[in-house]
Amino acid sequence: MQDELISVILPIYNVELYLKECIESVIRQSYKNLEIILVDDGSTDQSPYICDEYAKMDSRIKVIHKENGGLSDARNVGIQVSSGSYIALVDSDDLIAQSFIEELYECCIKSNAMIAVCAYSKFSNGDEIIISNNQGNAQIISGRELVKQIYCGQAGKFGFVAWNKLYSRKLFDSVQYPFGRIYEDTFTTYKLFLNSNQIALLNKSLYFYRIRPESIMS
């Protein structure tokens, strides 16, 4: 099942304290056929250096240094240069389980879904990360029905955030993240959902969202 190239895009801005841990969680993925795109969005700390050092150690890593343009712009740049059949967007202060890509890709292939979504857990520094042992089958739902459930508050952790998902690359042919817009995830993800006939929902926490005072959105 490990034949298609998958692009993992990390938008990066001043996250030197967390970046190594995030990159390590990506390069250790059980699914190995990855293109890892690190988009340094004009960082003023050691993040650019960390990106370059990891690129020397892993040939799958591509680094882009650009002027600061915000989270949406960094994501768009990464998507534009990506070559994978599927795309995952990982915030550079978060972590992903070792099987994150493999399990979501398997959901897409088995159900012919254009997007696969997993549950997520929040954590703070020092917290123990626990990966769910849930081995249940993914729920298959239409994009339109999922949007309806989200707006009705019935979707749980399968919402409009960008980062706990695997997307078919084709979806971004006509959709971009809006420059300078607040809640850019919501503005974009609902469009991606509506353009997807089928979405796979995996009720298993494979993405770990770090809670910290400052964030990549600042």
Task: Describe every region a protein language model picked out.
Residues 1-218:
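Nucleotide-sugar donor-binding/catalytic module of glycosyltransferases
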